[in-house]
Amino acid sequence: MTTESKTKTVTHILGYPRVGAQRELKFAQEKYWRGEIEQKELLAVGSELRQRHWKDQSASGLDFVTAGDFAWYDHVLTTSLLLGHVPARHNNGFPDLDTLFKVGRGQSQNSCGCGEAASDMTKWFNTNYHYIVPEFSKNDKFNVSWSQLFDEIAEAQKQGHNVKPVLLGPLSYLWLGKEVNDEEVEQGFDRLSLLPRLLTAYQAIFSKLSALGVEWVQIDEPILALELPKAWADSFKLAYQVIQSDVKLLLTTYFDGVEHHLDKITKLAVNGLHIDVSAAPDQLDAIVSALPKEWVLSVGAVNGRNVWRADLERLHERLQPVKEALGDKLWIASSCSLLHSPVDLDQETELSKETLQWFAFAKQKLREVTLLADALDGNQNAILACHQYSQPLRERESAEHINKPAVQQRLAAITPALAERAEAYSVRAQHQAEKLGLPLLPTTTIGSFPQTSDIRQQRSAYRTGKLNEQDYVTAMKGHIADAVERQERLDLDVLVHGEAERNDMVEYFAENLNGFQATRFGWVQSYGSRCVKPAIVVADIEREAPITVSWTQYAQSLTTKQMKGMLTGPVTILGWTFPREDITRKEIAQQLALVLRDEVSDLQQAGINIIQIDEPAIREGLPIKKSDQKAYLDWAVEAFKISAASAKSETQIHTHMCYSEFNEIIESVAALDADVITIETSRSNMELLKAFEDFNYPNEIGPGVYDIHSPNIPSQEWIVDLIETAAARVPVERLWVNPDCGLKTRNWKETEAALENMVKAAKALRKKWQSNAA
C-alpha cells in the first residue's frame, strides 16, 4: 500500500491553447485585419483569454501557471520580435503588433503598387502547427525591443498567480530559421555564427525576468530531440554558461527522446530537465539514472498532442518508482504544449456518454496532471480516482465495435502488387496526353475556392436540420455551377468543383467514413488565425458508399473541360486527425488507403479522368530522428500507392504537398509515382524545386506561382518570372501552373484577380515558347 509522501510533486504544463474555446482570438484577429475593430479591442480579447486560461490552470491545482505561451500569430515570430529580429523589408525601427502581422502575412499592395512578401512558414517539427521562419544574415543584430513577454508575466502576477514563463531557447531559435543571402552562404556564413550576439540578447531577457521576480523559466530546446550536427550539439554548453543567471532554468524537450544527447545535457548550466515520455517512454529510466542530483526532472506524462484520456492508473504504476527515487525533484507536466489539443471537452454536448469517457481536451488535461501528481504523493483518494478514471479505457480494449472483422480481412489481404499501377509513368503519360489533350503549361487550381458566408451558413443550416437535404443539394450545386462558370471565364485548363460542400479537407472524409468521431468545438490552431478541427479515429475505418462522386460528376456535366476529382490522401487524413492509440499509425493508414482506393475506382467509373489525392502532411509525419524515418516513409508511400493503384493508365493521378522541404524525402516523393505533383514554392522563390532538379524527378510538376496565404495579388510579371525560374529547373513540357494551395480562405475578388494574372502569364509564356520551338 502506498503511503502519503512528505514531498509534494510540482505540477505545470508547457503551454495552453491561445485561440479560446470558441475561437475568440481568431475572430478578433480577422476583424482587426479587415479594419472592423481597433487595436485596443484586439488587445482586450487577448488579455481576457490569457486571464481565463491562467484561472483554469490555477483552479485545477497546478503549482505554476505558464506565461509567454500566448502569441498573436505564432510563438517563433513572437520570439523574433522579442529579440528585435525583423526582416529589413518590414522593419521600420519600431516593431509593433502591425509589424508582427506584416512578417506573418505579408503587406498588401500600397499606393505605389508594391507589396512586401511574408516570411516563409513551415511545419513545427512533426505537427500540423506552422511557424514563421526567422531570416538570418551575417550582419544581424539582436536587441530586446518587444515587451509582450514581460507585460504578460506582470499581468499574471497582478492576478496573484505563481508564474513560470516559457521562452524558446537560443539554439532552437537559430536552428528553426534559415540563411537568406545566398552570396553570404557561398562565402561561408552559417547562422550558428550569430550565437554570441544572440546570447547577449538572452542575457538581457534574463535580467528583466530576474527583475520581475521570476524563479523558474521553461526554456524550450526541442531540437535536442533531433540527431544534431556536432557543431550544434557542442554549442549548448557555452550557450548555457553564458545565459545562466539567478533565474532557474528548466531545459525543456519534447516530441521525442533525448537520451542520445544525455552526456551533453547533464553538463549544462541549468536546474532541471523536462522530457516527453508520451512520445518516448523508453528514455525515462536512462534519464532518471543520469540526472544530476540537484536537478529537477519534469516528466511529460500527459499527452499534449492527442485527445485520448490519459491512462492514469498505468502512469501511476510506471512513475511510482521514479517518485521514490527523486522525491521532491520530480515534477509532472503535459508532454508538450497543450496548443496541439482542443480547448474544452465540456462543450461537446452531442457526444455519447461512452465516447465522452474516452477523451480529455486541454482543460481536462490540467486535472489529469494534478490528479496523477496527487496519486504519486500517496493520496489514497487520488490513487482510487486514477483507477476509476482509467476504467473506460479498459472497457474499450475489448469492445467488439472497435475492431471489425471485414476490415481486418482486407488488411490481411494486402500484397505488394496491390500498391502498383498497371504500367510505368512513361507509358501512362502517353495515354494521358492522348486522352486529356492539355496544352503546354496547363493551368489549374489546387481544389478549394472561397468559402463565402452563404456557403458556411447553408452547411450549418443543413447540419442543424434547418435546411432539408434537397434544398441543401440544390444550394451546393449552385455554388459548384458558379465556381465552374468563373473558371471557364478565366479560361483555366483543368477545373475543380470548388469543394463548397466541405468544411475541411479531412473532416469531410471523416464525417463520411465509419470509424471516426467528429466534434463541434475541437478546434486547434494551425497558423495565425487558421484553425482546424481534427476528427478522432475511434474504430476500424469503412466506407459505406461513394463520398465525392455525385458532386464531381455534376461539376463535370457543366463543362467540356477536364474536371479533377478531389480526395485527401491516407497519410494526410491520418496526420490531421487524432489517431487511435491502441493500433499503429501504419495500420490506420492502410485502412484509409483501402477506402480511398474504392473512391478512386468509383470516380473513374463515373467518367472523371483526373483525380487528385492530396498529401500535404506526408513530410510532417516524419519521425524527427533521421534514423527512424525510413520505416515511416516506407509505409506512408505504400499507403498512397494503394489508394492510387486502382486508376487506369489513362487516368491522371495528381498529388499536392504544401509547406514541405523535399530534399530529405525526394526519393519517397518520387516513389509515390503520382503523374503530377503540385507543391508550395512561391514564398521560397522556387528554391524547393532544387530538390526535384538535383534528383532528376521524372514526372510532371506544378510549382505554386503565388502565395494564397497572403492577401498580396501577384502581378503577371511576377508570375512570369517564377515560371521562368521553374522552367530553368524542370523541362517545360512537364510543368504545370497553379497556386501554392487551396483558395478556401481567400475572397473571390482577390482570387479571380490572382488567377487572371496566372492564366495570362501561362498563356504569354506558352505562346513565346511554342513560337521559339517552331
Curated annotation (Swiss-Prot):
What keywords is this UniProt entry annotated with?
Answer: Amino-acid biosynthesis, Metal-binding, Methionine biosynthesis, Methyltransferase, Repeat, Transferase, Zinc
4Fe-4S among the record's keywords? no
Which Pfam families did the record assign? Meth_synt_1, Meth_synt_2
Which cofactors go with this protein? Zn(2+)
Free-text comment on the cofactor: Binds 1 zinc ion per subunit.
Top enzyme class: transferase
Q: Which residues bind L-homocysteine?
A: I446, G447, S448, E499, D614
Q: What InterPro entries is this protein classified in?
A: Cbl-indep_Met_Synth_N (IPR013215), Cobalamin-indep_Met_synthase (IPR006276), Met_Synth_C/arc (IPR002629), UROD/MetE-like_sf (IPR038071)
Q: Name the pathway it acts in.
A: Amino-acid biosynthesis; L-methionine biosynthesis via de novo pathway; L-methionine from L-homocysteine (MetE route): step 1/1
Positions with a binding annotation for 5-methyltetrahydropteroyltri-L-glutamate: R23, E24, L25, K26, K123, R530, C531, W576, E620
For the ligand (L-methionine), the binding residues are I446, G447, S448, E499, D614
Q: Which residues form the active site?
A: H709 (proton donor)
Highest taxon of the lineage: Bacteria
Q: Which reaction does it catalyse?
A: 5-methyltetrahydropteroyltri-L-glutamate + L-homocysteine = tetrahydropteroyltri-L-glutamate + L-methionine
Cite a single GO BP annotation: methylation
Annotated binding of Zn(2+), by residue = H656, C658, E680, C741
Report the EC code(s) recorded for this entry.
2.1.1.14
* Position of the signal peptide: none
The GO terms this record gives for MF are: 5-methyltetrahydropteroyltriglutamate-homocysteine S-methyltransferase activity; zinc ion binding
This chain's function reads: Catalyzes the transfer of a methyl group from 5-methyltetrahydrofolate to homocysteine resulting in methionine formation.
By sequence similarity, the record places it as follows: Belongs to the vitamin-B12 independent methionine synthase family.
- The identity of this protein, by name, is 5-methyltetrahydropteroyltriglutamate--homocysteine methyltransferase
Task: Tell me the organism.
Answer: Aliivibrio fischeri (strain ATCC 700601 / ES114)
Give the organism's phylogenetic lineage: Bacteria, Pseudomonadati, Pseudomonadota, Gammaproteobacteria, Vibrionales
Per UniProt, what is the name of the gene that codes for the protein in this document? metE
